[in-house]
Amino acid sequence: MNVMEPISEKPKRDFLLPASILISALIVSLALVYNVGKRAEKGPESVSAGVASAPALEKVRAVNQDDHLRGKKDAPIVVVEFSDLECPYCKILHKTIQEVVAGYGDDVALVFRHFPLDELHSKARHEAEAAECANELGGSDKFWAYLDRLFAVTPSNNGLDPAELPRIAEYVGLPKGNFASCLSSGKYAARIQADEEEGMAAGVRGTPYSVLLLRNEASAGAKDFITATNSEIAQQLPPGSPPTLFVAADGKRVSMNGALPYELVKQVFDKLLNR
């Protein structure tokens, strides 16, 4: 993957090299083709008359005690990851985000919220409930262990055998019988639905979709970088595609749409942290 280089007329602003932009756009484009337009019956279309509507990032709630949090709640950046456990692009981005977050210590935290795409992955909602049962039986550490293991073993695209769910529970050290009882109860269906409805209200139409909650307003340089990079990527995407990167009006929320590559995600974080 190519690294960043400065534009000659504006030496303090960094932009992606064309090859890197093309790779980013290709990944994003595949994710959009895969997901967008599959949830029309559950909310407004994200594309209308060839013009994408702006995300309503203010609809993404602040982190609370019920969230699945990896890191510190008051971190300068909290990544809210809306994800489908059978989505192949979610599997890619989950690994990418984990790698990026690990390099920032207490500056970046991660929150996971469910967004199963039933029309594409009929198993994803049940798997989301399984992850919630892991949380009930073992707390936050077991939730993340279960989630990480599920992403590691699933072939994606509805390919995971449901018989693997209790095996994953056993693998991460959960009591198999209690897990099976929890999962069969369906007690977490409402929790999954609430995450999904929040995502829809914020403009999520496909997965993966991440919203960065910032403790402080993004700097002018960071906003310029995000806006310019989005414009470059947009040139490689079909007209009317939702924005790949977007900064909310208050400058304290940023969305990332699609399975963006490690280099681009890290550059966004570096800009937001003034590194």
Language model features: what each stretch is:
Residues 2-36, 166-275:
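C-terminal cap of thioredoxin/glutaredoxin-like
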Residues 37-55:
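Ser/Thr/Pro/Gly-rich low-complexity linker/stalk segments immediately outside membranes or between
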Residues 60-77, 102:
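A short beta-strand-turn-helix
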Residues 61, 67-68, 115, 149, ...:
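Flexible, active-site-adjacent loop/turn segments at secondary-structure boundaries
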Residues 64-67, 96-97, 196-197:
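A generic local structural motif
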